[in-house]
Amino acid sequence: MNTPPEPRFEGVPPPWRVIDLPGRGPLRLRDSGQPANSDPARPVLLLFHGWTVSADLNWGSAYAELTSRYRVLAWDQRGHGSNGLRSRRRFRLEDCADDAAAVMDVVGVEQAIAVGYSMGGAVAQLLWRRHPHMVSGMALCASAMKFRQTIAE
């Protein structure tokens, strides 16, 4: 059996906390929070990981640098990692985007910069399409506007 790679951390990652997403269930979230004496208007980053990996595997080596400038929120998307939301029903990327909006509501964030890698880029774009008032900017890495439309693609 293959063992998944361990995430690499530079410094200390943001702590985990458990939040309850109404109608969705509990979710473990990495939240760097607002440090004491920091600018309350400091931008918030939502970090969306790629397909088949976890938030820590995708972003672990970047947490220290990012949290020095931004409030960082990261979690495992549905069906990913050991902390993602679990459901018996199939999910769509739109569900992941709506999960992100629910996370923002629960933690009291009105707007954020959505940062997505691979599948996470599609989730970031869907968050912007479905909840445009919540997205103040986007950074997309190794992503696409949409994925396969037909089996031939």
Name each model feature, range by range:
Residues V44, R71, E110-I113, M134-G137:
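Structural signature of beta-strand start/N-cap positions in the alpha/beta core
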Residues Q77, M119, S143:
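Active-site loop/turn elements of alpha/beta-hydrolase fold enzymes
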Residues A122-R130, M134-E153:
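Flexible "cap/lid" loop of the alpha/beta hydrolase fold
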Residues P5-P26:
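N-terminal cap/lid segment of alpha/beta-hydrolase-fold proteins
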Residues E94-A112:
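Conserved acidic catalytic loop of the alpha/beta-hydrolase fold
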Residues P22-G84:
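Conserved HGGG/HGGXW glycine-rich cap/lid loop of the alpha/beta-hydrolase fold
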Residues H49, A112, G116-S118:
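Conserved alpha/beta-hydrolase "nucleophile elbow" surrounding the catalytic nucleophile
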